[in-house]
Amino acid sequence: MDLIGKNVVIYGAGISGVSAYELVRDKGGRAIIYDDDPTAERATNSVGVFQNADVIVLSPGVSLCKDFLFDAKLENKLVISELELASACTRATEIAITGTNGKTTTTRLIDAILKAAGKSSRALGNIGTAFSSIADKLDENDFAVIEASSFQLEGCLNFAPHIAVLLNVTPDHLERHGTMQKYMDAKAKIFAKQTEDDFLVYNADDDKIEGMIIGARSHKVPFSIVHPTNGGYISSGFVCFKGKPILPLDEVDFKGRELENVVAAVCVAMLLNVSPYIIAKAVADFKPDAYRRQLIGSIDGIAVFNDSKATNVYSCLSACEAMDGDFVLIMGGARREEDFDDFFRQVPITLKHVVVTGENQNDIMSCAFDRDFKSIESASSLKEALGLALAYARENKCKNLLFSPSSKSFDAYKNYIERGKTFDREVANCKNFERSK
């Protein structure tokens, strides 16, 4: 992308916005940051800056639906996302991962495997490090492993990663996108501009994805945790790729739907000719980020898991399916358009009791009763919910307690991390708590 002499407005003064600003300056453009917040550092809040803009770069938190952005498009101004800008300024081989759930884990898995294989790899994007902060410093020998959210993808025009990974698509962020179709359209931009020289690794168990990818021009590489495919799959206790066993399941710390992340990562690694031995060792050594079904310790012999990252129904369901033995669940949070009826229709029989708390607790209880799930009670706080869950587990000899909210955190917390830390503190304050080593 030629930015020399161009007037570029960066919309958003956060991490990705500031990184985009620096990238534009490095590429010879005239950059200015705009932010709705008049107190934002290094930014103006005067909308007049958009009048003279040649290019408008949107941070992930900025929706395309703003009226003056629509007007900008009518005036033939280029309106793009930070991801599009970074991609246009890099020579690295791009591997992009999207999906409603599992993006961060899969991104980190692929990055870990490539590093284990001696390749120069960077995990970037929605995972925390803005792609634009390093895009122009990477060359053709580097791999940019990019976690791409729907927010980042919706502003892409020509983004075409060499390998795109589509993990799953379930309802999420509809308050931003408006409809499920628009959400899916944003996700589809991860492969829309790929060519016959590129690869699309996709979840063959997801019916919505099967419909989305019909027109994809890239090589389609399916994966499944249910049945064999001509890509990645699970068979006889192994993750396999095109008929070849790659790694034994008993050596990895993933279960249930979590295995989708592993199989997808194996597909990418095999497409890049990484040896099965290196893949197996890297996956066996891998530790997921905090608050993803994380064992934090035990109380009176009851194992306590913190899955605060579960911000939607399907991520919670994935955690439930991965639990060994009977368990009690604490769930609930901010009220959004979540289908809890679907949750109680699919929960494993090992789920013995649910304690709900948060803004949407009445919605959850109503769906539970409609599905004839009667072992459920409500709590006015996370502390009370923990006490009720422990009491049930002790009385009924359940050996596991899972905190997996299935909801956004914004009813009471800044984000899922703050919520996870709060749960950690409540657990640590319990009598007879023993921290996991």
What are these regions (language model features)?
Residues 82-125:
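Walker A (P-loop) phosphate-binding motif
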Residues 24, 56, 97, 126, ...:
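Residue-level signal for inorganic ion chemistry
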Residues 32-35, 200-204, 330-331, 350-359:
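Short internal beta-strands
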Residues 341-399:
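C-terminal helical cap/extension that packs against the catalytic core
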Residues 138-222, 233-235, 246-254, 409-417:
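Flexible active-site lid/hinge loop adjacent to a nucleotide/diphosphate
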Residues 1-81, 85, 430:
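N-terminal leader/targeting and accessory segments in enzymes
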Residues 4-7, 19-23, 248-351:
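Nucleotide phosphate-binding/pyrophosphate-handling subdomain across enzymes
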Residues 35-38, 80-84, 218-234, 280-284, ...:
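Beta-strand->loop->alpha-helix junctions that form or flank phosphate-binding loops
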